[in-house]
């Protein structure tokens, strides 16, 4: 009877040990490959996705990653026409709030840029339609919500920015 108890306890300890190792391995795999572990990694992957979309559709455009520079949004898009705009990309599971919009507006002021495109991959942007436009203090912003539902929205946004650029440079 005593041996059965010892064998049972020993077996449970080994199972716990194995389960602990499985959990540790799982945590390592999630950290290495999972995008849900940190918003920074998730943001990086989202920005790369949009960068690839721009690069594929607009090979003559230049996209400079700025996410590592404070108050410079995620990137700056430059077209062959000379149009430059800041790019902000959000990959939230909830509606992008107004604080994020205000931060982007501050980034536009800081960089002295008067054109911007604010993109949400999966969700709505607070107070905005799926494709929307705002102007304030001679600054023009195109908002695109749920771009992953229809990647052609990016074309609309860039065409709008190019049209605005032509109007304001006159």
Task: Name these PLM-found stretches.
Residues 114-115, 140:
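Proline-centered loop/turn at the N-terminus of a beta-strand
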Residues 1-111, 118-119:
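Extended, gly/pro-poor, charged amphipathic helical "stalk/hinge" elements that serve as dimerization
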Residues 122-170:
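Domain-level recognition of nuclease-like catalytic cores that cleave nucleotide substrates
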């Amino acid at each position: 009877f005593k041996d059965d108890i010892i064998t049972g306890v020993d077996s449970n300890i080994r199972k716990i040990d194995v389960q602990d190792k499985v959990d540790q391995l799982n945590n390592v795999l999630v950290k290495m490959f999972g995008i849900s572990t940190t918003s920074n990694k998730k943001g990086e992957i989202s920005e790369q996705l949009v960068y690839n979309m721009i690069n594929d559709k607009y090979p003559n455009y230049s996209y400079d990653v700025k996410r590592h520079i404070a108050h410079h949004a995620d990137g700056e898009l430059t077209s062959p026409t000379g149009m430059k705009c800041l790019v902000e990309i959000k990959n939230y599971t909830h509606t992008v709030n107004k604080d994020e919009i205000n931060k982007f507006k501050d980034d536009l002021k800081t960089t002295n840029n008067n054109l911007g495109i604010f993109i949400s991959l999966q969700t709505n942007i607070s107070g905005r339609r799926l494709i929307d436009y705002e102007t304030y203090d001679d600054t023009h912003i195109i908002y695109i919500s749920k771009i992953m539902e229809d990647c052609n929205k990016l074309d609309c946004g860039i065409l709008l920015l190019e049209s605005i650029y032509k109007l304001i440079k006159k």
